[in-house]
Amino acid sequence: EYVIRVQRGPLPEKSWHIYKRYNDFVTLHNAFQTSGLPLPLPPKKLLGNMDREFIAERRVALQNYLNIVLMNPILASSLSVKRFLDPDNYSTPFHELALQHVSMALRSEANYEVVKPIPEIGWRLRKHYFLVKNRVNPQDELLLAWVEHGPDKYMDEKELQASFKTIGSLRHPYIQSIEFLSCNEVGGFVTRGLNNAGSLRDLICSAKPKLQFMKKYTNPKQCKPLPVSDVALFGHQILEALMFLHEKGLPFGHLHSGNIVIENHKVKLLDIENGVLGLPSYYRPYFVQHRKIQTLEAVDVYCFGHVLFEMIFGHPLHESVCDNLSPNCPSLLRSVLESIISSEACKKGLPTIGALLSHPFFNNSSYDLSHSERPHFKYSTHTKEALRLAWQKTESRLKEEQKMKQEQLHKQQQQQVLANGKSPERSESPNSTSTATSAGTVTPPTVPLEFPAAPPLPPPVSTSDVGAHVERAALLGSICNFNKAKLRPAVTPVSTHNGDDGRLS
């Protein structure tokens, strides 16, 4: 039996232990088969599997297996991994509860009915999708998404209802319109027209939109970058939409290629309601490590940099920052990416949305930016103030979490100095705190690995000769009396996409 120490977030006190046998790892491994990703699970052994050397080797192999799984955000955020590492909090039948909430909400709506669920097409465990139809126009396919409130939900129910009503009336040529939406004290749902071509990520990965998220994106067989002209055009359109939202006091904070669809060569942003519901951003494990990314505008710009990278190279950025862009990257686009996702940019500060719109790469008069739909978004003074306070609290929590991570990093560095006798390089890059990437790995954005603090140093040895002889004798005695048979197998922590951390011991 292996003991796994699991840690959530940067604080060691938020940790617990679970006990797993090899067969539990096999069950977890089988849950990943739909991904098609080769994972190094150590093979089963029938004879000699109680040999101590074999157990020690298997412990190392299982730790490596856990490390690789937890570095991949798609695998790490899957329900199978959550239940493996935190069975007490993830045994709830999430999908059944979501269906109950949706059914209750639609009872008062005579025009809509649920047709069938579309399971696991998104990355959020608590977000569930259903195919619904409007009885007035039954031929139109609609997609309903239900999600529970997140940790940044700061509005009361009355303010939330007013904000939702306002968001439902929003119109913009580069933002997907909403057919119907509702919320309660548990969560909310939004109904939009179903785009059969799928998201921008589906387009890049040549994936069918209704397939499971893990199957579509963990190990895509055919990825294709977009033409540079399309990257510039779509980038400009995204920036126009972001600028509009910020001017109206509704920052996005949830930009990624899965929240963008392309219709008639025009982008449409999805899930603009996520911020009001208090949901964490897809790229939060990345930008929480950079103290210069403290405003929601900086968050949107940073996420925009990742989307640009994915469009031009055909795959997500596997690091929190990128300092080695391909030499094939066009020079103008290179300057944009370097101003957003380079280590230097994340240390010194990112450009504003307005500055990016004026960049030569996007500011090209040949782009067809004409559109017939006139932007519209109005709300009451009370709703405007409620939104402002919610964003203010969201930014405050981000700053507090960044401060906590920096303090934890500083503590680890000090312990390394004392343990190794030399100071490691200080850096704000996530690479300084992990052995791998941040919000994706072998495929999409990885999660930063956070290692627990080193064990405390032993008390100082007495400076007297007598004390030194006594302690030396005690140490030699301990070495001579050491019994290897008393050792027990173990594995050690790595952090997951939402901050959970599993280490065998």
What positions do the PLM features span?
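Phox homology (PX) phosphoinositide-binding domain
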Residues: 1-153, 162
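Catalytic-loop of the protein kinase fold
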Residues: 242-263, 269
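Long, intrinsically disordered low-complexity linkers enriched in proline
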Residues: 426-505
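Regulatory extensions appended to serine/threonine kinase catalytic cores
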Residues: 368-460
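C-lobe/activation-segment region of protein kinase-like
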Residues: 268, 274-335
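Terminal C-lobe "cap" of eukaryotic-type protein kinase domains
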Residues: 344-370
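Activation segment signature within eukaryotic-like protein kinase domains
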Residues: 234-235
